[in-house]
C-alpha cells in the first residue's frame, strides 16, 4: 500500500516542481535594483537621471546609460566595463579607480571629472569632452581619442593609447 502512495506522489511532486520553474520571473525596475543592490548588469538606464544616486562600487557592466545624467555622481571603483555611455553627462563625476574597459563614451561630457587611476582600456571617447578632467595614473591603452577635448586635462603617469606615459 505504501508503494502505491509513493508511486502516485512522486509524479505529482515532479509536475508541481516543473510548474514552479516555468513561472515568469517578476520584472524588477532597474532603478530600484540599482538603488537597493548597487548593481544593474545589462540594464537599460538610457536617459536616466542618476544625480541623486551614490554609485560607489556599483556594478553596471554592459548596461545602456546612453544620454544618462550622472553629473557629480560618486562612481568611485564602479564597474562599467562594456557599458554604453554615449552622450552621457558625467561632468564633475568621481570615477576614481573605476573600470570602463571597452565602454562607449563617444560624445560624453566628462569635463571636470576625476578619472584618477581609472581603467579606460579600449574605450571609445570619440568627440568626448574631457576639459579639466583629472587623468592621473589612468590607463588609456588602445582608447580612441579622436576629436576629444583635452584642454586643461591633468596627466600624471597616464598610460596613453599607444602605451606611452604622459
Swiss-Prot record:
Domain Pentapeptide repeat, first and last residues per copy: 38-77, 78-117, 118-157
Tell me the domain of life.
Bacteria
Is Oxidoreductase among this UniProt entry's keywords?
no
Repeat as a keyword of this entry, yes or no, is yes
**PROSITE patterns associated with the record:** PROKAR_LIPOPROTEIN
* Taxonomic lineage of the native organism: Bacteria, Bacillati, Cyanobacteriota, Cyanophyceae, Synechococcales
Q: Which InterPro entries does the UniProt record give? A: 5peptide_repeat
Quote the protein name from its UniProt record. Uncharacterized protein slr0516
Entry keyword set: Repeat
Amino acid at each position: 500500500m505504501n508503494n502505491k502512495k509513493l508511486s502516485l506522489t512522486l509524479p505529482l511532486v515532479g509536475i508541481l516542481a516543473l510548474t514552479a520553474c516555468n513561472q515568469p520571473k517578476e520584472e524588477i525596475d532597474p532603478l530600484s535594483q540599482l538603488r537597493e543592490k548597487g548593481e544593474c548588469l545589462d540594464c537599460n538606464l538610457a536617459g536616466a537621471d542618476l544625480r541623486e544616486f551614490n554609485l560607489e562600487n556599483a556594478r553596471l557592466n554592459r548596461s545602456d546609460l546612453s544620454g544618462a545624467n550622472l553629473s557629480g555622481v560618486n562612481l568611485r571603483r564602479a564597474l562599467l566595463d562594456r557599458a554604453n555611455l554615449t552622450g552621457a553627462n558625467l561632468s564633475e563625476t568621481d570615477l576614481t579607480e573605476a573600470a570602463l574597459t571597452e565602454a562607449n563614451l563617444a560624445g560624453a561630457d566628462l569635463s571636470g571629472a576625476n578619472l584618477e587611476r581609472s581603467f579606460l582600456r579600449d574605450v571609445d571617447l570619440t568627440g568626448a569632452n574631457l576639459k579639466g578632467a583629472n587623468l592621473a595614473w589612468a590607463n588609456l591603452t588602445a582608447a580612441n581619442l579622436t576629436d576629444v577635448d583635452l584642454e586643461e586635462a591633468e596627466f600624471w603617469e597616464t598610460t596613453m593609447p599607444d602605451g606611452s606615459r604622459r
